[in-house]
Amino acid sequence: LLDHTDATLAALKRLRAHGISVALDDFGTGYSSLRYLRAFPFDRVKIDAAFVGELPSDEGAGAIVRAICNLCQAFSLSVTAEGIETDPQRVFVKEAGCSFGQGYLFAAPMPLESFMAYLDQMRAA
C-alpha cells in the first residue's frame, strides 16, 4: 500500500463504487498502519489473531484489542476479530466492541460446497 498510494486509493474507490466492501486485514501486525485508517476507504478492520489468541488472560493484548475497537468506532468502521478459538475469547472481543468474529470456535476453513451446507444448517437452526 505504501509504495503505490495513489493507485491503491483509486482501486479501493472503484471497488467500493461497485458495492464491494473492503477490509484491512491483520491489523496491528506487520505492515498495517494507523495511517491506512485515514488514507484509504476501508469498511472493516480485522484484528490479527496474534492478539485474540492471548485473550482474555493477557492484559496487554486485551488493551490493544479494546484500543483498536475504540479507534475503529471513531472512524465508523466495523471490526472483525480473527482467530477466536474459545468462548472466553468470543465474550471478550464482543464486549470490547467487535461486530464480527472468525475462528475455529465457529468453524474450520472449508470448501465452498461445505460452507453452503453449513450456512443452510445455521439458517435452519
Which functions belong to the PLM regions below?
Residues 10-18:
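Catalytic-core regions built around general acid/base machinery
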Residues 1-6, 18-125:
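EAL-family c-di-GMP phosphodiesterase catalytic domain
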